Amino acid sequence: MSKRTTYCGLVTEAFLGQEITLKGWVNNRRDLGGLIFVDLRDREGIVQVVFNPAFSEEALKIAETVRSEYVVEVQGTVTKRDPETVNPKIKTGQVEVQVTNIKVINKSETPPFSINEENVNVDENIRLKYRYLDLRRQELAQTFKMRHQITRSIRQYLDDEGFFDIETPVLTKSTPEGARDYLVPSRVHDGEFYALPQSPQLFKQLLMISGFDKYYQIVKCFRDEDLRADRQPEFTQVDIEMSFVDQEDVMQMGEEMLKKVVKEVKGVEINGAFPRMTYKEAMRRYGSDKPDTRFEMELIDVSQLGRDMDFKVFKDTVENDGEIKAIVAKGAAEQYTRKDMDALTEFVNIYGAKGLAWVKVVEDGLTGPIGRFFETENVETLLTLTGAEAGDLVMFVADKPNVVAQSLGALRVKLAKELGLIDETKLNFLWVTDWPLLEYDEDAKRYVAAHHPFTSPKEADIAKLGTAPEEAEANAYDIVLNGYELGGGSIRIHDGELQEKMFEVLGFTKEQAQEQFGFLLDAFKYGAPPHGGIALGLDRLVMLLTNRTNLRDTIAFPKTASATCLLTNAPSEVSDKQLEELSLRIRH
């Protein structure tokens, strides 16, 4: 077997006249009666190889037997294509290889679906079952090439900045961090369990107490939670922690790193600092803590209408401490029928809204179901507050503030997609800061950490932990990209007494706190430096930078929406002997 000269996708005019050896898969084969053309494929792309009896009759005979996905080795001379056969769509489109020798390395059965780019309309479950074939597609191959480039860029940046890459345990202790843990029974310790880490949070804090100063890890994390398009049970996190820093230091580091990544893998220079917005401002203007700022359509407070109008829904809402907000779809009045509006009403119902009121702005006033409730002065108020003009569609939700925010926040994104308002070429990064430290869980009747229990409150708000916990703000910051939460971080608590107070506010008894987190509280007794960090979702970053819409397309062997692996049929039953060794019994 000869040595490969180069990759198929890298054969360009620089190789003209050279005899080369290529190895790869038959992408397709065309028999033109006396001549056979084969597109040979590898991870870098496709090159056309030609079997011509003038060069080798023996090679032509073998080529007659090859089929799609055969693995072959070819030797031949690189020549320029005839002008009428040049393919400008591919990097190798100016050249072809006149084959003098071919060897079939391995045959292939007919694949369950075509690997050609033109034939990707295949049921996703079939693609996942034969994932090793799916990954041969150039589109996915390029996605994973970019994933490699992204991780390489991240590592280079962090290495240059003096960070140590340190691994943390995969088998660890189950602690209450929000999502359900994946549990691993211990054979040695009967009746006891390890947990797979939801994040290396506590270990990276312990590494700061150990004096390592700057840590990072590109690490697998596990959360047993309901899945959706941008979530997986196991995912990869870029985990970073730094000592003797404040919030500004961490945000600046994260920003510099992301700018470097985008420049190196996308060729896009991001000038200036990322925009910043407080949590309250994001919720007020966009109805979301991860707003997509690539388009306008902000939420506008029109609660004044509830005080001025004789419209019971609006009036009752304001009198019961609710609010009325509107969004304006510019020029969309004619695009949405009453049936369409009924569908949008059903959409906001999902988010708890009782209804969706709407009007269309025309030259002489308003039309629509509630248009008749608007007196002339009410119309003027609406147009002044919203800036709406003739041809615009104005939609209202009147309810509790959180319902208004969630429903209109989701609706603006839906409308933007339907109306084509989103510039898909934009990369709109945004920092969301000044988060609430705590949230109140109505079901559990207690406070829970908005991020995690180790986030420090703002110094000015520490006293509020004992008096008004719901008002305390955190030294926390999220990085958002195009409406997706890319990652989040915070300055951590580094004082044992404050950490114990935080556990108390969260409803832990001293005994429970010691049992769950005693190792951390003990570590705080031995000189903990101020520290903080951030964690970025690598899979999500790759998804956004490669313009994918599904997280599964960025993971080599992903799980389905029901957390199964169709390739290996995991999870699976295990033998009675294995269960017995673990002292486990399955109850159906």
Swiss-Prot record:
Pfam families in alphabetical order: GAD, tRNA-synt_2, tRNA_anti-codon
Top EC category: ligase
One CC-aspect GO term: cytoplasm
UniProt cross-references to Gene3D superfamilies, sorted A to Z: Bira Bifunctional Protein, Domain 2, GAD-like domain, Nucleic acid-binding proteins
Localisation per UniProt entry: Cytoplasm
Binding site for ATP: 223-225, 232, 485, 537-540
Region spans: Aspartate: 201-204
InterPro entries to which the protein is assigned, alphabetical: Aa-tRNA-synt_II (IPR004364), aa-tRNA-synth_II (IPR006195), aa-tRNA-synth_II/BPL/LPL (IPR045864), Asp-tRNA-ligase_1 (IPR004524), Asp-tRNA-ligase_1_N (IPR047089), Asp/Asn-tRNA-synth_IIb (IPR002312), AspRS_core (IPR047090), GAD-like_sf (IPR004115)
Catalytic activity: tRNA(Asp) + L-aspartate + ATP = L-aspartyl-tRNA(Asp) + AMP + diphosphate
Highest taxon of the lineage: Bacteria
Gene Ontology MF annotations: aspartate-tRNA ligase activity; ATP binding; catalytic activity, acting on a protein; nucleic acid binding; transferase activity
UniProt keywords, alphabetically: Aminoacyl-tRNA synthetase, ATP-binding, Cytoplasm, Ligase, Nucleotide-binding, Protein biosynthesis
GO biological process, one term: aspartyl-tRNA aminoacylation
Keyword Ligase part of the UniProt annotation: yes
EC number annotated for this UniProt entry: 6.1.1.12
Residues binding L-aspartate: 177, 223, 451, 492
HAMAP family assigned to the protein according to its UniProt record, in alphabetical order: Asp_tRNA_synth_type1 (MF_00044)
Subunit-structure text: Homodimer.
Function (record text): Catalyzes the attachment of L-aspartate to tRNA(Asp) in a two-step reaction: L-aspartate is first activated by ATP to form Asp-AMP and then transferred to the acceptor end of tRNA(Asp).
UniProt record similarity statement: Belongs to the class-II aminoacyl-tRNA synthetase family. Type 1 subfamily.
Record's protein name: Aspartate--tRNA ligase
Organism of provenance: Staphylococcus aureus (strain NCTC 8325 / PS 47)
